Amino acid sequence: QFEAGSPVAVILASGDLTLGGVGTITRREGDRILAFGHPMLGSGSVELPIGSAEIVDVVSSYQTSFKLSNIGEVAGTLWQDSTPGIQGELGRIPYMIPISINSNAGIQNPISGKIAEHRQLTPSMALVYAAQAILTSKEGPDGSTIQGSMKLSLEDHEAPLELKRSGVGFGGAIDILFSFAEVVDLVLNGSQEFPRIAGIQFNFQTENREMSQILHSLRLSSARIQPGESVQLTITTRDRSGKAILHEVEVPLPPAPAGSSFTLFVADANALRSYDGIAKNDPSRPL
């Protein structure tokens, strides 16, 4: 084990879901190993887990042959990922982020494990882990309404960051997953600092019926608002049966001098998704 010619794994996720890349050890000196003969991701200096691996079979292909393998426990740290190969040290275990997913419709519940700490990989691994619960539910996401929440705990922060999203069907499930991954990415890459995530918790509640509504009409209490006042909105939506539902919404306005103008954007999910796709790179779009 961990000798020249034996397999080694770079572990991106462990626990109920295991993900990683497997290659061959080129050389070992003491607790240090050189492996792969090519980069894993080409990330340079990193702190990723490495562990044992077992090659089950080699699948031959004219296009790209590949190995079927099992990944074992974390046993060390990959600290250099460059063009000649990867370098790691056995015995030094890197930090991994605890993750758990609860779902009322999951085939397995809860799902828990750990994911690698990495600016680019952590958001993707969190998305993949959460997808195991939301996309592999007993009934599947099609025709269902999904309520999703994410709790992101940071070291040195008492209160966790909490986010809630809702969606209908497969498209709604994908929107929820990517919106959560975007927040994780923003936390890790939104500044020069690299905050340590102490844990990620997901919760998904699925109902086997579509609870979607479309926006039918909107009425403002007044188009002219005094400083410090709020905008009163009466919104009418309709469900799938055509039944009208009234919503009274109060929107506070930020302090501004007299004569200022504001743009308020109100949309249902389909319109908002289209609007985001068109105006994503427009800095002047209304909030």
What would you call each of these model-derived segments?
Residues 1-287:
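Terminal presequence/propeptide segments associated with secretion/organelle targeting
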